[in-house]
């Protein structure tokens, strides 16, 4: 179910924030969010539960926590200013929400890069049904 929802949202939001986050991920990891991260582990993609499976999944868990602190922002749809230059992601000036969302995405993309050496292809299309147990606190 999570996979179908993500694909539907990405098709609708071709010019939206999710495309920006994908560009950051690709810039840092050289991998497209779909298929490499959109369905990875228990937290990469829409929603999440249980314990993160590894360092990559933990990046997504922390990203979810970051978004959780922005309850009054439209984290899935706000478009924010940013640039990709000289090996760095730089968030630009925008509304408070845009700047915070950009920072959440920047930090997550950089975390995914740092976790590349432990990426496990076995978690790439991990079924939600295997994500059990209590979720960690942010």
Curated annotation (Swiss-Prot):
Ca(2+) binds at residues 43, 45, 47, 64. One of its GO terms (cellular component) is extracellular region. Expressed by the venom gland. Binds 1 Ca(2+) ion. Residues 1-16 form the signal peptide. It comes from the Eukaryota. This is Basic phospholipase A2 canebraxin B. It comes from Crotalus horridus (Timber rattlesnake).
């Amino acid at each position: 179910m999570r996979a179908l929802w993500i694909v539907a949202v990405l098709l609708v939001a071709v010019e939206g924030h999710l495309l920006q986050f994908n560009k950051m991920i690709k810039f840092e990891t050289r991998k497209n969010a779909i298929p490499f991260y959109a369905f990875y582990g228990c937290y990469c993609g829409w929603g999440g539960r249980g314990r993160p499976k590894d360092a990559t999944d933990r990046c997504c868990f922390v990203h979810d926590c970051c978004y959780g602190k922005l309850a009054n922002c439209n984290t899935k749809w706000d478009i924010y200013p940013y640039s990709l230059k000289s090996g760095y992601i730089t968030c630009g000036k925008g509304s408070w929400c845009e700047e915070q969302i950009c920072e959440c995405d920047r930090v997550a993309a950089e975390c995914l890069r740092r976790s590349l050496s432990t990426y496990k292809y076995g978690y790439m299309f991990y079924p939600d049904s295997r994500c059990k147990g209590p979720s960690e606190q942010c």
